[in-house]
């Protein structure tokens, strides 16, 4: 058994608290913010993202664009059977008012 040592300050970073709801988890936002700021400085107004699987990345892109005054365009694959988790993610996207473009999934 590992002994417990006292008098050590341990700092813990909670990614789940860095961006409060309705934002997605921090891990989906931390890298994209600076990238989108640079695109905005370059005059970009629309940011496209193609969702390739069931992930939170589209949610992160939509949130970050809304925060920065950009317009997200999410290309959304349409599957024969839509898993419940994907329905949940799509609902999360919509609260940030992206343009959602359905695309045929293979």
Whereabouts are the PLM-identified features?
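Short active-site-adjacent helix-start/loop capping segments
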Residues: 21, 55-60, 81-85
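A short, small-residue-rich loop immediately preceding and capping a beta-strand
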Residues: 43-62, 68-77
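Conserved beta-strand segments of alpha/beta enzyme cores
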Residues: 9-11, 71, 99-100
């Amino acid at each position: 058994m590992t002994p417990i040592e006292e008098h050590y300050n341990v700092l813990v970073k909670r990614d789940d608290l860095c961006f409060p709801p309705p934002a997605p988890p921090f891990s989906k936002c931390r890298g994209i913010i600076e990238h989108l700021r640079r695109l905005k400085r370059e005059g970009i107004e629309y940011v496209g993202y193609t969702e390739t699987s069931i992930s939170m990345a589209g949610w992160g892109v939509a949130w970050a664009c809304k925060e920065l005054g950009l317009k997200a365009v999410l290309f959304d694959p349409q599957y024969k059977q839509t898993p419940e988790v994907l329905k949940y993610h799509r609902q999360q996207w919509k609260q940030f008012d992206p343009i959602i473009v359905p695309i045929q999934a293979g």
